[in-house]
């Protein structure tokens, strides 16, 4: 039989930063054109502890995400906008101000996402946190989308940061300030040496790092993904059609 390689191995995670695409506005269109979704904070938390041979790359670098953080006029309130559709639409022609998308009147109020008032949680912002504070933090809970994931990530990363860097506190949340008009920014998470901080004041035109995730990888994080061969597809189709024929005969 002729030996043809008809399997396409899909990269579950692909870095879109390059010399020709250094910022968020340049990278996002490439992610979308490659039929991928931008990495989320939750994706990163799933991947970092279980990255196999590439684990040091995942742990020691910062990563931008497709999760957005929207601020109201004046910046007294903010929303965590998971998998922001507005961020997925940006490109090099997108208008921005001070590195943020400016939201038109009424858009902030319409955005779906958990809202927080800075004054209510000011004691938990702009500083490093203990592991227990992270696990109970309402913003980290919103970003992780799953309390068990947040607990696992916090325990493992704190243990490693203690061993490698003698850190007892980390994972602080650092937000934008002085937002005079409603804005939307992309969230990113720092590497472990920088204490795995959450940063919500990303400048979209600075040097950034976006990772595109293959849709198939969302259900199989960390695993290689292969498209089935033509032979496999035909075999399954024939099997399915044969079963259908049997069912029809029974009727």
What are these regions (language model features)?
Residues 1-37, 43-251:
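A binding-site-centric feature that preferentially detects glycan-recognition modules on secreted/surface proteins
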